[in-house]
């Protein structure tokens, strides 16, 4: 008897099938009764069937013999277990990936499109090979006449790889779907099926081999019953692509056609339509458009959440409250998501916080396990000659905690040493062969605290030596070994003799003791797979061992492998993904992540053969030999699958989406969400935090999870109900409640430390630098952390912007000092002679340890080469410009301050009890002098090197953030005798020298004037190299600095940006950047005022979180290392930026006079 039962998506077809099958079993217990369901729901269906059988006997439990609940794969093993000829070892996904990688590398020269293998490509190829095998397709019979070049090339490569694959596994392995082929062979020969009954349900589609199984059973078995859920609960032979139930109707059509072509009798019946539809059935009718509208849609609740966190919390809160208040069980709830990985960091922690048991049936990949990480990074270290000991891989191995030396008795001690070793390695730039050197060889540089602690360095050096020896010994042996058996023994011994296997056992036991059965299984599953892979490799490649091939196969295999999972309790919320078959019987279903990008879940990435490729191959397919377009089937089935998800909920279904993703990007709801909204489904807004008292119920669960929300609303609202809830919570969590309530009153503004503690940190007198005080004015809290507590980010010896800047400075410093020592005027050198001088300077610099370590990296060598080009360009421009001016570089990197030849800025600090001073130290990049003996005068200018263009900002100076240039001028003024002896020291100004070789764009107006003529002086980007900054507006001083301007009208300066002569006489000067001698004196006085004021606040212990902000894009937090300490949020009332804006010279001088108490 063959029956095809159809029903709607809400009809209890599984219940019908189970009842029919159990009735048949009870009537004929001596005969076999089989219930066949998708593998995903086999366990729950089996439990349900046995419970149903027990209930029919009015028992709580029962034993069965001939009643079987199986999936197709289990059905195959059922019949194969007694077969005379058993199957060879099954080749799982991981081993298949290994074999295919091997074949692709072997057949490289014959293949057209496969240049190299990768895990994604291997996965696609393997699925296609399984399809070809499953689909009885002979690739040699494909007609290539009308195929395009892409399809021809793919078939060409597929044929080569497929034949090689089949040849390799013949007699040794079976594919995971070969068992289905063997099943059909056995069933076709089985004469005992005439008394067996088969019942199929919860399928919407069958593979070709599964379809063949059903067809054999239809011809040989006593009973075959199949149940299908369609749109109207009937068979529609005219269904077309795009119809709601097209995929399942196609499945039914193939079965019916098979029966009709062979004149086989069958009965088609429809599940009866109830007279009074339930809300669930009404929803299904609405979704399948069998009714156009309803008065009220009670079955659905739409949820618009502020974020994924809010969405996940809504789910947990709803489940918690339903279980607590409405007698639900946890197993009554199902959570579905189009992509469950998006909610990994939200959903499971929130469920755990609310003590909600759950089972996540999303398969967990093995590739993230520490053992796989260890193997991958060992492989990265295989090249001991050309690319040895890559720091990233060495550290990654240590951090797996699998390769721990035996002298460590406590893991905490090992972790401490790994952290210290990482700090040391990064600080000293240790990479490649430098790992072979003892760490003691690096400590002379004294770049970190650890360099001065010999005992600690010795400990981490021992760990370094251990790892280097283990890696070296392993790969030295493997490189020399050509026999696969011996090579695998070497690798296996490495894992076992170094305690890695023992470590995995410890992890397993610890997880078992903690009751985490899922985690406890992982080490064992991983180790079992590794053993199997080693066996498989030996079977695939028994003779000639290839190191790279072995590791590539191993890594590819692990990337394809997943951990098997079991639920730790039967009463648990189930987490799954849309599209996976689910058992019926859930009371409430949550569909989360219903965004426009996720639902419908359109598959955009094709398989190895695309839809276009398969369309071209259609003419070569037959009814019993074809390839299906799984991507197309998936996309056509989306509406139907969503309807199935809606129908799973007996009581209610919740569909939710987040308004924002983790990157704060706006998300739109799915078209399915919008469609339900159009049908009249109510929408609820779930916020991240309760905005008012009435919303609090949306956040209340257990005391632990609810406390934060109670504290939040308590800080914003005064209500007796909140006080009562907090009192109740305090009974369960007294310490945590106190801590959270105290935290809700937390103000992240730092407290002043007072004069006594400030004196301990800084001393009685403040010894500081200009740049440090600039940090104070940028954000005084950062000054405290940096120079008070001396916090530092971890030092990494890498060639960054700071290192590049240091190299620029050092190059120019040594050049100036070298020329002065040799009494050479830079202006007298030729271009070639200057380059020779620079090369000699560079050779000396690069031999120093701090740069020599960087030169081990070829890329760093290239960067140094680029920097040398830049310094040459700047130096050559400087040499040429000296023809315009008598100013010559007299001092470079000139230090000032206590114990220096040059006095620093020493000032008494006012308004502070006791006698306190501030002493500023620092270095001036360059001081240029010109001696005018006939005038008893020395002209001076300060030069400061910058790696990018910079202008002196008056607003920044006024607020203490740009003190450097004025302070340097103050140092010159205070050291008149040093620079000019008895003569007068005249200040030309302080200027920035941009160190760059950047050229102007060809279409820049700086290169081409309004008449479309080329600006000659801009061809080599000379304007970018001219001095910018503060300049004297004294005509006499200007002419002394650049004599060639004398007597010329409308002549632009060749040295200073914005300076030139006017047509009618006089000078054109940069607006707001030119000052008279009296104005310079005012700037110097204000500079000292700012220095004293900052020093007073520092020594009095005042600290503020007051970062500056200049406009919208520039602020003190942009490059700060302490943002995680500040927790600065401009939206909080306690946190405010110190706003700064540019100002004119006029406004600056007025404000300075006000501050200093001077009258105009």
Swiss-Prot record:
Q: Name one GO molecular function term.
A: double-stranded DNA binding
Identify the cofactor(s): Mg(2+)
Question: Which terms does the UniProt entry file under GO BP?
Answer: double-strand break repair via homologous recombination
The keyword Mitochondrion is annotated on this UniProt entry: no
Q: Which UniProt keywords apply?
A: ATP-binding, DNA damage, DNA repair, DNA-binding, Exonuclease, Helicase, Hydrolase, Nuclease, Nucleotide-binding
Does the keyword Nucleotide-binding feature in the UniProt annotation? yes
Give a single Pfam family match: PDDEXK_1
Family according to the record = Belongs to the helicase family. AddB/RexB type 2 subfamily.
Q: What else is known?
A: Despite having helicase-like domains, this subunit does not have helicase activity.
Q: What is this protein called?
A: ATP-dependent helicase/deoxyribonuclease subunit B
- State the organism's lineage: Bacteria, Bacillati, Bacillota, Bacilli, Lactobacillales
């Amino acid at each position: 008897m063959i029956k095809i039962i159809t029903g709607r998506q809400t009809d209890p077809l599984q219940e019908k099938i189970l009842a029919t099958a159990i009735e048949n079993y009870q009537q004929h217990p001596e005969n076999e009764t089989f219930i066949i369901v998708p593998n995903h729901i086999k366990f729950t269906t089996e439990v349900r069937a046995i419970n149903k059988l027990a209930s029919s006997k009015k028992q709580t439990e029962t034993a069965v013999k001939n009643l079987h609940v199986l999936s197709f794969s289990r059905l195959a093993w059922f019949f194969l277990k007694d077969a005379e000829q058993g199957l060879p070892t099954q080749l799982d996904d991981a081993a298949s990936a290994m074999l295919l990688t091997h074949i692709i590398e072997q057949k490289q020269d014959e293949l057209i499109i496969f240049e190299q293998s990768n895990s994604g490509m291997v996965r696609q190829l393997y699925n296609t090979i399984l399809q070809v095998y499953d689909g009885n397709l002979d690739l040699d019979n494909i007609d290539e006449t009308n195929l395009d070049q892409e399809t021809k090339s793919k078939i060409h490569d597929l044929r080569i790889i497929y034949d090689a694959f089949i040849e390799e596994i013949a007699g040794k392995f079976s594919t995971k779907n070969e068992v289905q082929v063997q099943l059909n062979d056995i069933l076709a020969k089985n004469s005992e099926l005439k008394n067996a009954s088969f019942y199929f349900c919860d399928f919407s589609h069958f593979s070709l081999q599964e379809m063949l199984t059903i067809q054999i059973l239809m011809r040989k078995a006593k009973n075959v019953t199949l149940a299908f859920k369609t749109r109207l609960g009937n068979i529609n032979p005219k269904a077309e692509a795009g119809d709601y139930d097209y995929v399942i109707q196609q499945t039914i059509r193939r079965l019916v056609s098979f029966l009709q072509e062979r004149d086989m009798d069958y009965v088609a019946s429809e599940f009866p339509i109830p007279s009074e539809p339930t809300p669930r059935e009404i929803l299904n009718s609405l979704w399948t458009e069998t009714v156009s509208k309803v008065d009220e849609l009670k079955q659905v609740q739409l949820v618009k959440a502020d974020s994924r966190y809010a969405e996940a919390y809504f789910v947990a809160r709803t489940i918690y409250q339903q279980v607590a208040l409405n007698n639900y069980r946890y197993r009554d709830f199902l959570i579905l998501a189009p992509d469950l990985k998006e909610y990994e960091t939200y959903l499971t922690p929130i469920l755990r916080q609310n003590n909600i048991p759950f089972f996540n049936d999303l398969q967990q990949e093995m590739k993230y396990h520490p053992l796989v990480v260890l193997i991958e990074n060992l492989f990265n270290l295989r090249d001991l000659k050309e690319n040895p000991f890559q720091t990233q891989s060495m550290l990654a191995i240590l951090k797996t905690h699998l390769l721990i030396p035996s002298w460590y008795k406590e893991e905490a001690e090992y972790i401490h040493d790994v952290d210290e070793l990482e700090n040391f390695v990064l600080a000293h730039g240790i990479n490649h062969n430098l790992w072979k050197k003892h760490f003691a060889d690096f400590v002379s540089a004294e770049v970190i605290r650890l360099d001065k602690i010999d005992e600690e360095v010795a400990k981490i050096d021992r760990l370094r030596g251990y790892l280097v020896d283990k890696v070296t010994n392993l790969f030295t042996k493997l490189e020399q070994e050509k026999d696969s058996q011996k090579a695998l023994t070497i690798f296996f011994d490495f894992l076992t003799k170094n305690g890695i296997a023992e470590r995995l056992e410890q992890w397993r036991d610890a997880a078992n003791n903690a009751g985490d059965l899922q985690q406890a299984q992982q080490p064992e599953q991983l180790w079992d797979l590794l053993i199997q892979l080693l066996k498989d490799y030996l079977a695939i490649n028994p003779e000639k061992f290839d190191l790279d091939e072995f590791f590539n196969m191993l890594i590819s295999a692990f990337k394809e492998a997943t951990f098997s999972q079991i639920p730790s309790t039967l009463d648990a919320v189930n987490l799954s993904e849309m599209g996976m078959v689910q058992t019926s019987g859930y009371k409430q279903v949550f569909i989360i992540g219903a965004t426009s990008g996720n639902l419908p879940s359109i598959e955009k990435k094709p398989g190895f053969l695309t839809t276009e490729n398969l369309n071209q191959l259609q003419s070569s397919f037959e009814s019993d030999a074809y390839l299906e377009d799984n991507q197309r089937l998936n996309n056509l089935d989306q509406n139907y699958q969503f309807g199935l998800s809606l129908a799973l909920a007996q009581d209610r279904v919740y569909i939710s989406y987040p308004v924002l993703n983790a990157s704060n990007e706006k998300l739109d709801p799915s078209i399915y969400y919008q469609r339900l909204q159009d049908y009249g489904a109510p929408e609820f807004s779930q916020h991240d935090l309760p905005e008012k008292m009435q919303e609090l119920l949306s956040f209340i669960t257990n005391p632990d999870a609810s406390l934060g929300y109670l504290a939040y609303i308590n800080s914003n609202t005064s209500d007796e109900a909140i006080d009562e809830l907090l009192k109740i919570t305090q009974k369960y969590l007294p310490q945590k409640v106190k801590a959270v309530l105290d935290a809700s009153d937390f103000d992240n503004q730092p407290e002043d430390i007072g004069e006594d503690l400030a004196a301990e940190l800084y001393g009685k007198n403040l010894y500081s630098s200009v740049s440090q005080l600039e940090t104070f004015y940028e954000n005084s809290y950062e000054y405290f952390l940096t120079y008070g507590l001396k916090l530092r980010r971890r030092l990494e010896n890498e060639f960054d912007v700071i290192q590049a800047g240091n190299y620029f400075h050092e190059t120019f410093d040594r050049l100036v000092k070298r020329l002065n020592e040799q009494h050479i005027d830079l202006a007298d050198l030729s271009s070639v002679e200057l380059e020779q001088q620079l090369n000699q300077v560079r050779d000396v610099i690069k031999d120093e340890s701090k740069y020599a370590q960087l030169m081990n990296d070829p890329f760093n060598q290239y960067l140094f080469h680029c920097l040398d080009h830049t310094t040459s360009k700047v130096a050559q421009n400087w040499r040429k410009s000296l023809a315009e001016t008598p100013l010559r570089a007299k001092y470079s990197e000139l230090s000032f301050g206590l114990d220096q030849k040059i006095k620093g800025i020493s000032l008494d600090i006012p308004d502070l009890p006791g006698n306190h001073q501030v002493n500023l130290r620092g270095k001036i990049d360059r001081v240029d002098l010109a001696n005018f003996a006939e005038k008893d005068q020395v002209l001076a200018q300060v030069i400061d090197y910058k790696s990018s263009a910079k202008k002196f900002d008056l607003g920044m100076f006024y607020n203490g953030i740009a003190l450097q240039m004025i302070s340097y001028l103050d140092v010159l003024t205070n050291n008149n005798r040093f620079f000019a002896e008895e003569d007068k020291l005249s200040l030309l100004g302080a200027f920035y020298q941009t160190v760059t070789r950047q050229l102007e764009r060809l279409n820049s107006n700086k290169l081409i004037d309004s008449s479309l003529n080329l600006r000659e002086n801009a061809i080599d980007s000379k304007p970018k190299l001219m001095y910018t900054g503060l300049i004297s507006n004294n005509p006499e001083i200007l002419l002394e600095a650049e004599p060639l301007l004398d007597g010329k009208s409308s002549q632009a300066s060749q040295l200073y940006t914005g300076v030139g002569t006017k047509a009618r006489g006089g000078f054109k000067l940069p607006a707001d950047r030119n000052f008279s001698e009296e104005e310079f004196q005012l700037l110097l006085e204000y500079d000292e005022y700012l220095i004293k004021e900052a020093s007073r606040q520092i020594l009095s212990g005042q600290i503020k979180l007051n970062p500056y902000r200049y406009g919208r894009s520039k602020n003190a937090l942009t490059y700060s290392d302490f943002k995680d300490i500040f927790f600065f949020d401009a939206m909080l009332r306690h946190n405010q930026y110190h706003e700064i804006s540019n100002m004119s010279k006029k406004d600056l001088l007025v404000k300075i006079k006000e501050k200093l108490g001077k009258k105009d």
